[in-house]
Amino acid sequence: MIETKRDKVQKFTIVILTIFAIVNFELLFLKFININNSIISLYTKISIILLIFYISYRLIKNGITVQRLLNLLPDIIFIFIGLLVTDSERVFQFFLIGRQIISLINMRTLSNNKGKITDKISDNPPVLVMLTFFFTIFIGSLLLMLPVSTVHGEETTLLGAIFTSTSATCVTGLIVYDTGTHFTLFGQMIILTLIQIGGLGIMTISSAFAIILGQKLSLRRESIMQNVSGESSKLDMINLVKNVIIVTITLELLGATILYFTFISKSYNINSAMYHAIFHSVSAFCNAGFSLYPDSLMRYLDNFSINFAITSLIIMGGIGFPVMKDIQRTIKNRVSFKRLSLHSKIVISSTIVLLAMGTIVFFISEYNNEMKGFNFQDRMFASYFQSVTTRTAGFNTIDTSNLSKGSSFASGILMFIGASPGSTGGGVKTTALVVVLVAVIAMFRGHKDVNIFKRKVSEKIIKKVMALVAASVAFLALMIFLLLLVEPFTFEKTVFEAISAFGTVGLSMGITNSLSSAGQIIIVLLMYLGRVGPLTLMFAISETKDRSYFTFTEEKISIG
């Protein structure tokens, strides 16, 4: 094979990028062990110049378009950070390492070689989803480490930044720094942006930009959107993206309006009331649970407006966009709700049942415990709010660290179940719960088929659900075991923290701030994989095609 000039240039570029990545790592090591060296600053300036040269080369070679400018936006942002923000060498060098790794992955050294890494990634939607979340967390961590992101005198460590960025992007709500006092307005806006991106999904937002720019969604992007949104078909995917954006903005603005008038009545000034209203509205709809108050929403336990607005936003964000679209279509066409899709019927019915059961359980369990001394109205508010938020939101109006054992157990179950497919929440999802329960009931009754609302559930779906639940339980059990090894906390608190992270809930029994570095890393993994999904992970690292070319002889085994 004759090596072309382009191949030589690409190989040379890979060598240069590799050298720069290694040198960056070495300089960061020197920085961490407090060795002051003027070479570090000089190298940072050279790196900025090279990055400017790289951007200019790309634009001159390919031409200037809106899409290409959007693709180069992270590079442009970090050039300004490197030039304008003081004490940003460490952050900029972290960005360069990540940028160079991405460049190495994107380089197509062997143009005629099939099975390139980039092709395998781009042809596998689950892998793309995982990588987009990963790089969003990476960029968010860098931004949160900037001096401008924290108040004067405070410092955000690398692990703390990764933890916070992961929690925001995966819409969890577990924190190692108090959001309202540790971070500046800039840092809080970074967190809010990560929440919105993580809640809607990176692919949803990028697809929305593509539609705005007048581009058509490719089959590959439609496949990714189908995976992210929970749609059962690829039909009308452009309208789905539009509806997701419109519904999100409408509901968040509506929730923010209700919260704004409530905060104004609490002696907030206009700007503060507006900002707090928008922040908590977005956080609630995205099921994130981030609050600007150190006690979450405990101060508003008896406030009807805030309880109503927050819980409504959480529920709407948790049922999923396909269900909201189905409800909208049903109302618009003035047809019976019996015409809803099977998916919508399962989600709505299971949500109502779980909310009702959760409210009753918390009302009984905390009657003489955390709610002792409350009047009936406050008990109902607190019980209902706890039932709603435990399923993935993470806000709280009562002290979660003082929950009774019964409430802790019930919370663990609700957190593991989580929200619904295509929603902003996590967990194994309500549809999985219903399918498993109905399948077990059908087996006990001797029924061959699994039927829900007079519709048969395919065997393929049942196998996927079983795989999802099994993978979730196995992964969660492993992470709990590791947490118990590295942390001194009680079994109850450790299990609660792990399930909360995996279900992207954000409730804690007060141990998050005291976690060791190893414990924080485990929680980060739980939050990330809890949001991406165990089943997505399984599909991402293995071929999904059936490779069974023959079958073995069947033989019975003893069970029980």
Segment roles from a protein language model:
Residues 1-560:
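Membrane-proximal intracellular helices of multi-pass ion channels
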